[in-house]
């Protein structure tokens, strides 16, 4: 029997503890990095906003370029060793930047400092692309059953949201009182704690997966190149209607959330009449809603199932976002933002067991490596599109429908809510309830038996056999998880 203080199991508890410490360290690091760039490296410069945005661009490039191919290697490698190796790499990178930052700011040109910052962020995010699918796969091995997997996802979500609330308030005092170096060293130390926690997790050694997932496991894994394994992962994903459905409504929903993330600062100050100094309360409201949703998610999934939870959460959150777009007061807006984040976090939690069960063990790394870059790309496109619409095409928009007035920002956010509603309607049809649909196979739902959900390999491969919608949190600038 597991100890009373365990979360699901002792091994999962140790894995969670490492994530908790590392997440707080990431938030401290990301907030510190933004403060350092904005107030020191680019202080009083006209290009300061561009310098700050470069941090986001560096992280996004790593996700889009490294993310898809990382899953191939994760499926090949030992998952626990992969996680340990990435923690060593990330801790070393942050520690190295911390040591260099002991130099006076004027010791190096601003361009050199920014190159060091962007390079570090890019490498941290690149390493995280290996860490995330490896952790995803280990959780699948440690936690079984839809309810427990949903509970594990809920705990993970709650931990991330808590770090979002705790990290930034820690970062500012560290930065302004002790300096950027000590805030960075705090993050490096968090990677060390995570390394120790992960090294104590006991994971049964897995058999090396064949490159094409055919299950024969002979020598083709050595003959197959990375590209072939990557294509095999894409083929597996594309032949699973269930996985494609998950990706489609995740991307549609991400368009809605991405627009909110981009324009929320303008909505709260212009439509809600809130002072920019109070914008921190928006992040706190999102964090509170995320924690409540994460804590409720496991029970909700247990009651109505992961599939029904997914499409219901999309419909509810979409309707709440439309309602949020009509608010004109600070209190009402904050309350609706909390309520909106709750079902969205429940949605993220419900999707975890669906992904875990839909992907065969040898493809889990590649499934995650397809999912994350696509949703990241959707978020980037949504941010660019919504910003362009608000600043150009709809800048002077002023209309009314049935006595309700619409301006540019609230109109875009309302359309974003409709996108999430559309995603929910699509999910309702694409993810039928288990009692009304038979799962299995590449065109069905999650694999319930060995080989379910795997695509039939082409003849030449059989002859020679050889891989989530984010809560509207303030951008984790520089975060690597």
Task: Please identify what each model-predicted range represents.
Residues 1-449, 454-455, 460, 479:
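Alpha-helical transmembrane-bundle signature of multi-pass membrane transport and export proteins
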Residues 79, 466-469:
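Compositionally biased, intrinsically disordered low-complexity regions used as flexible
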Residues 466, 479-481:
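Soluble, non-transmembrane alpha-helical interaction regions
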Residues 470, 476-477:
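Basic polycationic patches enriched in arginine
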